[in-house]
Design a protein with these regions (language model features):
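Extended serine/threonine-enriched, polar tracts that run as long, contiguous segments within proteins
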Residues: 94-114
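C-terminal domain/tail detector
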Residues: 166-203
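Structural signal for well-ordered, non-membrane alpha-helices
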Residues: 26, 97, 119-122, 161, ...
């Protein structure tokens, strides 16, 4: 409500998260424009270009990680015949590993490991969700190289998120720990579970 007082948590970490969101949005829009010529994405990228440039000046390491990972992924995905799924998965992990490190400190290695494992999980989960559309559009999908279908990915995805939660439980988190647990132990599975349930009903 506009007349009620609100408690907002704003600090250097929330500002950092907002900056990384801008950087990721910029590269995602430019990638969509390059791959599928989505003109609206190009316009949006242009509208946030100045903000992105400011972010890149503040966080060159992170923005370099995003651009290099996208370029590497593009090379992997375009070399369809020789594309190795594990390389694409690791590439996504490497990108997120750098974004999870705001600054170098005692916990940097743990945060890099957390980001790396989470990045791999997200990439494989997205691939599972996009499998049917990717085949229809003849897009690269690592599941094809793995000879797996989405419904056969549960064990691999469980192992990936298990690696994530193992590192998560060792981090010195105090605030909103229960919310993060809810996401990592349940929320990340919501769309996948719904998709599998719909498929079972359809073929059941």
């Amino acid at each position: 409500h506009p007349l009620h007082k609100k408690t907002e948590t704003e600090n250097k970490f929330t500002a950092y998260a907002a900056d990384m969101t801008i950087a990721l949005a910029y590269y995602k829009c430019m990638d969509d424009w390059k791959d599928e010529k989505k003109y609206l994405k190009r316009l949006y990228a242009e509208s946030i270009k100045k903000q992105y440039q400011e972010v890149a000046e503040k966080y060159p390491r992170q923005c370099k990680a995003i651009s290099e990972s996208i370029r590497e992924l593009e090379q992997i995905e375009n070399s369809t015949a020789d594309a190795k799924p594990d390389e694409a998965v690791k590439c996504s992990g490497k990108m997120l590993s750098e974004l999870f490190v705001y600054e170098e400190d005692f916990w940097s290695n743990s945060l890099r490991s957390f980001g790396f494992e989470l990045g791999q999980f997200i990439y494989l989960m997205d691939a599972s969700m996009d499998y049917k559309e990717d085949i229809r559009k003849h897009n690269y999908n690592p599941l094809i190289g793995m000879n797996k279908k989405p419904e056969e990915m549960k064990e691999i995805l469980t192992m990936c998120i298990g690696n994530v939660t193992q590192i998560f439980e060792k981090l010195p988190l105090v605030q909103d720990q229960h919310l993060l647990r809810n996401i990592l132990y349940g929320g990340v599975w919501q769309k996948y579970s719904e998709k599998m349930q719909r498929k079972e009903k359809k073929h059941g």
